[in-house]
Curated annotation (Swiss-Prot):
Record's subunit section: Homodimer. Probably interacts with PlsY.
Taxonomic source organism: Shewanella sp. (strain W3-18-1)
Subcellular localization, as worded in the UniProt entry: Cytoplasm
Name the UniProt record assigns to this protein: Phosphate acyltransferase
An annotated GO BP: fatty acid biosynthetic process
Amino acid sequence: MTSLTLALDAMGGDHGPHVTVPAALRALQLHSFLQIILVGDKTEIDVYLRQADPQLLSRIEVIHTDEVVSMSDRPVHALRTRKNSSMRLAIELVRDARASACVSAGNTGALMAMAKVLLKTLPGIDRPALVSCLPAVTQKPVYLLDLGANVSCDSETLFQFAVMGSVLCEAVDKKSRPKVALLNVGVEEIKGNDQVQQAAQLLQHTEQINYTGFIEGDEIYSGNVDVIVCDGFVGNITLKTSEGIAKLLVHQLKRGLTQGLFVRFLAKLIAPRIQAVLSQMNPDHYNGASLLGLRGIVVKSHGNADETAYLQAISLAVTEAQRRLPEMIKDRLESILLDINN
């Protein structure tokens, strides 16, 4: 397979190289075609490379910088002053075609600002969107966007999100004509604000998008649709609420299975099945949010991701790079706009 290079912001997130470097080494073990550029403090990075397999080390490059974007940096401040930061240098590697994708667990606002300025948006895309997947009862992922990059959106922006989400589902899951819905306060056609109503009108007249109508919050995890579109304000609250409920359920399940001798005995008997269920509910299982609509690939990992979760974000970046996701979005949007204009 053709070689593929990823740029990792090794210093981003709560744990920095303690998580990013071991995850990078595991990614290299999984993908023999993969090359990785680690951007960050070389002294800190080298601590985790000392015992690594020499064959893996031959596929790693380290670019040194001791400047880091902190979680408290405002996006504009980071954009103006953190010009030698590990985050910015990693994105620049994508811009300069030295890497096919970038992964960072750093400051989301700063990552979005830098990516938009350095990589630019695709033709026909006004704003990038942050998208990730949620679990569903059908055992297939459901893509939700936007997750907070754009607090308020007009109808045209929501329409663009629907196009990008549909293409992402096709590219990553290889699903033909994924079902797309708008998140709303009701399923009736008269429900919703002006932006959602107008976005629905646009999607209803777009044959290339398999638009199924409105969906309410209680149906998000049903698996009845593949892509759910909303503005970033609603999307971020939905995501954080989902993660909180998942943690609550895991906590309650674990506590319930430790109360009483007979219950503990049964829990041991079905431990593998319990572990499988808990894994499906764990937000880390779905780690990795894509910044869609850019001319390059950028994947955002949770800031508190552990090694396994960060590896998931790397794997997502690999898949998107292999599918050439930005080009797919660009081509599909051009085709849709051509149909609309004709």
